C-alpha cells in the first residue's frame, strides 16, 4: 500500500514538473520568441535541471508540440462550455453570433494562445504544419454551427474560412499591434482594456451585420470579462493581459 501511494505521489510530482516546464516555456516563447529560447534558458527559468527537461520532453520542439496539443484540448473544452452557456432555443443566427463574438473576447483577454500561434508562424512550416494537422475537431465543431445557420438562413452568404480569418485578424492585430491599437483611441484616454473592448465592438458590429442580428439582440458588455466563460487552463494559457 505504501509503495502504491509513493508511486501516485511520484506520478503527480512528475506531472506537476511537466506542467511547470510547459508553463515556463510558453511564457518565454511569447516574450522572446521560440527561436531565441533554449532548453537551458527554460531550465534556469523553471528551476529544474536540463536533463529533467530532456527526460520529459526530449527537445524544445516537443515542448512546443505538447503546448499545441494542450491548446487544442483547452480550446475545444472552452468551445463546448461556451456553446452550453448559450440558450439552445435561440435562432441559429444568434447562437452563431454569440459564439463567435464571445470566443473572440476570450482570445483578446487571454492572449498567450494567439501569441504562440503567431510565433509559430514566424518559425516556418514545421511548427505550423503540426498545429494545423491537429485541429480536425475544432474544424468540425465550427462547421456544425455554420451548417445549421445555412440550413435556417439559406439566402445568407457566409464562408466559415472567411469568418475564421476575420477572427484571426482581430485577435492577432490587438495582440501584436498593441501600440497602434492604443494610438487609435488615445484621444479618449482609453485604457488598454477599454481599447480591447472598442476593438472587439468593431468585430461585434461586423458579425451582427453578416448574421442578421438586430441592435436589440446584440451584446454590448461593459467589459470583455463580462462575457467570458470560466475555464481554468492547467498550464496557464488563461493568464489575463494586464490593462
Spans of model-derived segments:
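Short alpha-helical scaffolding segments that buttress acidic/His motifs in well-ordered protein cores
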Residues: 100-103, 116-121, 167, 171
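Generic hydrophobic, amphipathic alpha-helix propensity
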Residues: 17-26, 42, 67-78
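Helix-turn-helix
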Residues: 20, 28-62, 66
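Hydrophobic alpha-helical connector segments
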Residues: 66, 80-113, 152-155, 160-164
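Amphipathic alpha-helical packing segments from all-alpha helical-bundle domains
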Residues: 76-80, 125-151, 162, 194-201
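C-terminal peripheral helix-coil segments that are non-catalytic and often amphipathic
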Residues: 2, 147-151, 170-243
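Amphipathic alpha-helical segments used for helix-helix packing
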Residues: 107-129, 177-183
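Arg/Lys-rich, glycine/proline-spaced intrinsically disordered segments
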Residues: 3-8
Amino acid at each position: 500500500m505504501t509503495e502504491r501511494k509513493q508511486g501516485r505521489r511520484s506520478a503527480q510530482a512528475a506531472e506537476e514538473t511537466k506542467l511547470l516546464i510547459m508553463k515556463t516555456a510558453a511564457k518565454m516563447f511569447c516574450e522572446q520568441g521560440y527561436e531565441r529560447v533554449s532548453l537551458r534558458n527554460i531550465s534556469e527559468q523553471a528551476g529544474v535541471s536540463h536533463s529533467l527537461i530532456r527526460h520529459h520532453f526530449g527537445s524544445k520542439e516537443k515542448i512546443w508540440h505538447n503546448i499545441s496539443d494542450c491548446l487544442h484540448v483547452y480550446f475545444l473544452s472552452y468551445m463546448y462550455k461556451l456553446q452550453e452557456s448559450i440558450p439552445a432555443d435561440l435562432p441559429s443566427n444568434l447562437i452563431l453570433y454569440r459564439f463567435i463574438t464571445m470566443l473572440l473576447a476570450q482570445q483578446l483577454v487571454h492572449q498567450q494562445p494567439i501569441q504562440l500561434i503567431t510565433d509559430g508562424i514566424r518559425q516556418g512550416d514545421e511548427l505550423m504544419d503540426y498545429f494545423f494537422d491537429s485541429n480536425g475537431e475544432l474544424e468540425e465543431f465550427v462547421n456544425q454551427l455554420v451548417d445549421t445557420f445555412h440550413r435556417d438562413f439559406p439566402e445568407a452568404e457566409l464562408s466559415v474560412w472567411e469568418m475564421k480569418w476575420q477572427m484571426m485578424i482581430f485577435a492577432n492585430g490587438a495582440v501584436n499591434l498593441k501600440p497602434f491599437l492604443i494610438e487609435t483611441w488615445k484621444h479618449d484616454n482609453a485604457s488598454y482594456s477599454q481599447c480591447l473592448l472598442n476593438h472587439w465592438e468593431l468585430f461585434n458590429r461586423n458579425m451582427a451585420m453578416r448574421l442578421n442580428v438586430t441592435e436589440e439582440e446584440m451584446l454590448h458588455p461593459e467589459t470583455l470579462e463580462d462575457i467570458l466563460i470560466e475555464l481554468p487552463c492547467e498550464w496557464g494559457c488563461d493568464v489575463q493581459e494586464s490593462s
